[in-house]
From Swiss-Prot:
Cross-referenced SUPFAM superfamilies: Fibronectin type III (SSF49265)
Record-linked InterPro entries: FN3_dom (IPR003961), FN3_sf (IPR036116), Ig-like_fold (IPR013783)
Domain Fibronectin type-III: 11-106
Protein's name according to its UniProt entry: Oncosphere antigen B
Remaining remarks: ONCA and ONCB are the primary targets of protective antibody responses.
Amino acid sequence: EFRKSDIGSSLPQHFRWSQVGSQSIQLSWDDHKVNGHTPDQVHLFVIPRSSSLQRVEKQVAFSAKTVILEGLHGNTLYYVILTVSAGEEECSITSAQSELRSMCIK
C-alpha cells in the first residue's frame, strides 16, 4: 500500500500519482502543452534503490494520459524519472524526479 506521504510531490503541474493495487501505481496527466509544445511521448525510468532489483523503463503515447507501473516490491525506495518529449527532438522538454516508497506489500 502506498500512503500519500510515500509519494514524492515533485511532479510538474498536470501530472499525478494514484495507487491502483498493492504492487502497482499509476501516473496520470491532463492534456496540456509543455513550453508551448504538444508532447507526443512520456518516458518513465523507474530505478529501485536496491541494486538487486531490475530497473524498469516505460514509454507511452502522451495521448494515453496514463501509465501503470506494476510489480513494485515492498519496503523498496524507487526513483522515478519522468521525461516528456515532442516531435523528433531527442531532448526532453520537461523532466521531474519523484520518489516512491512501496510499503506493506504482501
